[in-house]
Amino acid sequence: MSSALLEEVGWDADFAIPVANAENKALEEQIRKKQKDILNLDNKLNKHKDVINALTEHLKNLKQEVSHNQALCKAKEKETESEVHLKALAERETGRLKQEITRLESQLTTLNEKKNAQENSIFKATQKIDELTSQLNWDQQTLEAFLQESAHKDEDTMAIIKYAKQDERKIKELTLNIEKLTLESNQKRKTLDNELTETVTSQIALDKTAESFRQAHTERQELISQWENTIEQMRKRDQDIQQCAMMLAELNQTIREKNDLIKERKDFLEREIENNKELERNIGTVERQAFRLRQQLQEEEKNQRRLQDEVEVLKGTVDRTATDVETSRSQLSSMKKDIQDKTTKVEEAQLHNAALEEKLRMVTEAVLNGEEQAAQMEQLLREQEQNIKEIDSQLLRQKELLFKKSQEVQALRDKEKNVTAEICATRTALSNLDSKLRKLDQNFLQQQMIISNQDFQIQMLERKTLHLQGKVNTEEKKALEKKVADLAASLEEKKKTAANLNKQLKKLQDDIRCIKKDTEKIGAEKTNLSTKIQEVELFIETSEKERKKSRLKKQDSMVEKGLLKMEVQRLRNLLYDRADGVLTLEKRRLQLQTAMKEREEEIRVHREMLNKQVKLTEQERQGLSAAVNEAMSKIDKQRKRYEVLSVSLAPPEGEEDKSQAYFIIKAAQEKEELQRKGDELDAKIRKTEKEIHALENTLQVVNNCNSTHRKALTKVTESSPAHQEKLKLEEQRRAAEEKYKYKRRQTQELQEDIESMSNTLEGLLQEEKVLNEGIERTQAHVLSLNKDILSQEEKINRAVKQCAKYTKEIRSGKQSTEKTFEERDIELRELRDFNKSINKMLLDAMEGNPELSSILQIHFTQAGLSLPSPSSTPSSRLSSKPSSARSSASLHRSSNLSASSSPRSQSVSSPQMKTVDLGLGLSVTSPRGSQPSSAGSSRSSSKCKSP
């Protein structure tokens, strides 16, 4: 795998394959673990997806089953509703029929009553007619008799004619009324017959429709039972499918696990092959490194043995210096006691010294002129400069050696980073020993310089004494020798006291210098710490503000996130509702299509049945109407025949009335029965026509619904408003999802920033705690150092007072208030040192800022001076050390060159030298340095310049 990748990259086969370090290996291991976790999660995800798919399929089946059950329930409900409807129709029909029967019965009773009344009126009219006819017959007979008897009475005859005419009119009116009533009764009989026929036909149609409804009900029950059987079979099939889906998911899971295991083993095999190759390469490199490290170890062991030898030597020197320090401390304590004893002797010797100095001054003025003194001083300066050059060369050698040692130590540190703490401890010990070695070298050089200066002074004094001895007589020579011996003894005592004082003063100066350095370092550290604390506080404040801002942003983002979630949920719910609505509409469309097909089939069958029934009823009606017409014609014929027969036969009165009423009643009953049947048939026909009209209306409604659903299910065009609204909603959903992702990423970044800020804040708080502890320690150290400074200042003040006292005594002994030659010489040397330090400072500044060289050149040319060059600095630095005191200061400065070379430090450490003239041609030069014998005199000379 790696070889293929390297070939793709274009890696040269001559070069070694790059090997990952420990961190990258750990990252690769983490990546492999993450990939393994990702594979496991993918397997789980696929498993869950399979389960979800199986559950969704099962849910779909359940929904389908529920929909089937709902449809079955709806069918049952429709069946019950249809049964209730049929029952209600039957009840209404029975109620209507009962009402119709009651109405017909009431009409029948009223008609019977009317018929009876009419028959009674007809019977009475016939009786009256009979009576009238009988009366008429009688009247005619009587009239004939009367005419015969009373022909001559015209008035009576006219009256009788008049009454006869009136009777005839009444008879005509009554006959007309009888005819009208008979016509009305015939019409009512006809209407009754029609109603009877209609009722009969409607009853027949109702019976047929009821029979068809019963058949449809039984067919529906059979269909529902078949539907239940199919649903049960589908449920069983769904259970089988669900079991198969679960088994399929398990099989897929096992297949995925086996594939993952195979893939993991393949990856493991490839990794092991790569690891073996990498291990072989690493073994080769490690063997080569081990060989190099063995060689380096041998070299380091040699260096370590050499350094251990040097450490042992340095330990011996440290022990010796410790013993010297202890002895010097004991001598200092004894010298403090001797000072009090010798101060009295010094006072006595000062009086004697004054006289001797006066004599010595006179002798020196007589013997030595200014040129000889200048030559001597130049010779002294040359010798001192030669000594200083030698010391500087030694210092340079030591510095080079120190630089080499530091380079070696740095190389060792670079090579041995993973060594034990013991080697680190030895390094720190070596660095401490190096510093002690440098201090001891400085002390050794200072001692050599002091010894050389003392030898030179002794030679000078011997020259002076020899010169003086050649020009004095024996008595004076003896006296002078005696005085010289006394003065030498006093000089030795004074040297001892001066040495002790110089030791004390040097110690005090060293302590003060160290304390000042420590205080400066502590002050610098304090300022740095205060600035760091301020920066930390500012950082804490800014981080707190940023944390608050981030918290507010986080809250806003959380609110926006919640709003986005709500919006997304709303849109999702809307989308799901739309999808559910589409699914429900699709299902509804399918259901309506099936129901519509069933209903159309039922309507078609019912229509055909109704058409057949209408045809049958029409045929029956036509047959009945033909039969009725025939019956009516027969009745008319029979009635006419009956009238003819009744007129012809003329039965007796009682029989005639009875037979006529009987036949009339019988004919009326038959007619009424036929009318009732006709009415029933007409009602059935009207009902079926209404049902056909209602079914046509429902069919129209179903067709309209189907057309609307067909329009709803047709493919939406891109220019339609529904499609535009859908695109708009999808765009809003995408924008909301992108905004949600951006906000979630922003919240994650803010959380990471907050975590990093909290980590940095914790680190800063820990640093602040550590710094506070360091500040407290430094403050305690500063307090202790301040106490030491106060005690040392008291000692310095006492020493300064003593030095001032000595200078006054020396000037009073010389009887001069002006500065002595030695003091002027010291001032000259200080000015030279100051000039050289200024030149060095300018050169350092020009090295740091090259643009200053032109400006300084202009100022120097205006002042008539030459700009110092870098080549003159070593000689100037060497020439700035004319005495042993300046050599110690230069050593101190050279030891601090790596840190800083400020003029202030140089001016503080500028050497001073005081030459004490004893009046006998003997002078003692006391330089300032690190040695106790020179420190006191230099300090006293620097303090005694201006009494």
Curated annotation (Swiss-Prot):
Coiled-coil residue windows: 16-194, 221-402, 471-522, 582-813
Biased composition (Low complexity): 866-911, 926-947
Disruption phenotype: Defects are the cause of a phenotype related to primary ciliary dyskinesia (PCD). Embryos display heart-looping defects at 36 hours post-fertilization and bilateral or lack of spaw expression at the left lateral plate mesoderm in 14 somite embryos, consistent with compromised fluid flow at the Kupffer's vesicle due to impaired ciliary motility.
Top-rank lineage group of the source organism: Eukaryota
CC terms in the record's Gene Ontology section: axoneme; extracellular region
Protein family membership: Belongs to the CCDC39 family.
Cited function: Required for assembly of dynein regulatory complex (DRC) and inner dynein arm (IDA) complexes, which are responsible for ciliary beat regulation, thereby playing a central role in motility in cilia and flagella. Probably acts together with ccdc40 to form a molecular ruler that determines the 96 nanometer (nm) repeat length and arrangements of components in cilia and flagella. Not required for outer dynein arm complexes assembly.
Protein name: Coiled-coil domain-containing protein 39
